[in-house]
Amino acid sequence: MRGYKQLKIPVLDAAGNPAWPEMFPVKRIEEMRDSVGHRHFMAQMMLQAVPPERTRLDPGALQFYDAEFDAAHCRLAGARMTGLAAYWDPSTGRRKSDGSVCVLIYRDDGARRAYLHDVRYLVVDDGDAHPLSRQCDMVLDFMHQHDLRRIAIETNGIGNALPEIMRDVAARRGANVYIQKIINTRNKETRILDAIEPLLTTGRLFAHTRLQGSPLMAEMMGWSPLGATGHDDGIDAVAGALMMTPYVLRPPGAAIRPFAANTNFKI
């Protein structure tokens, strides 16, 4: 391999013309840019890596809406929703501890859009003898408000005991809930960046107006992928909700398409 030369040809030249128009016409290139976001597009298709320290989560790039979910038609803000994700990233909930955050996201996978519908920061009194049980009550209130029956709980660390506590609290309230356990092993900054940045930079991350004055906005403004910039518990929970497999939404009474195998063959 001595004396080799490296050939680099970005998908677009300096004038914006495609290098291989028969394979990658302008329309397809724009679709790729919208799909993966600016950072991945520049690195993979333009061969220009964006330094991590230059990446930010600008709350001004959020598309705000003021509407509630229409369960009868599975619609939100004029769009048909295909799935939802309710996610709880827990902590002790004490005032000086990491934030304990519950998130609800709706998804329109046809348009590759996500709708950040509500974020609840859970805080319990420092003198509360049962802070985890109290938080479970708060999460059940959150679920009741949004007519939810299932939630994912991050079970790293303190969350390991929460599914059973949650079931006990729900049983006492006569609530029937389904709990999905989530274990995160990826670096937190990478997880946040990969989940949020592509949607945010392509105008496909929507947020309810109730969140405009929430701590989430300050977290986004102060966040850096280099870490150690302050609180990021809300955006970490949002990233978890975006990366989990969503629960499929169907309007009440919608028929489920049957699938049947063709067994009319000979061996």
Model region roles, listed by residue range:
Residues 90-92, 157:
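Short, glycine/acidic-enriched loop or turn micro-motifs at the edges of active sites
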Residues 242-267:
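Acidic two-metal-ion nuclease catalytic site recognized across multiple nuclease folds
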Residues 227-243:
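Charged alpha-helix within mobile-element recombinases
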Residues 1-31, 48-52, 56, 108-227:
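Mg2+-dependent endonuclease catalytic cores in nucleic-acid-processing enzymes, primarily RNase H-like
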Residues 101, 134-138, 236:
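Well-ordered alpha-helical segments embedded in enzymatic catalytic cores
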Residues 96-110:
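Acidic, metal-ligating active-site segments
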Residues 77-80, 93-98, 231:
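A short catalytic or substrate-binding loop motif that flags glycine-/basic-rich loops and adjacent residues
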Residues 15-90:
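ATPase catalytic-site recognition across NTP-hydrolyzing enzymes
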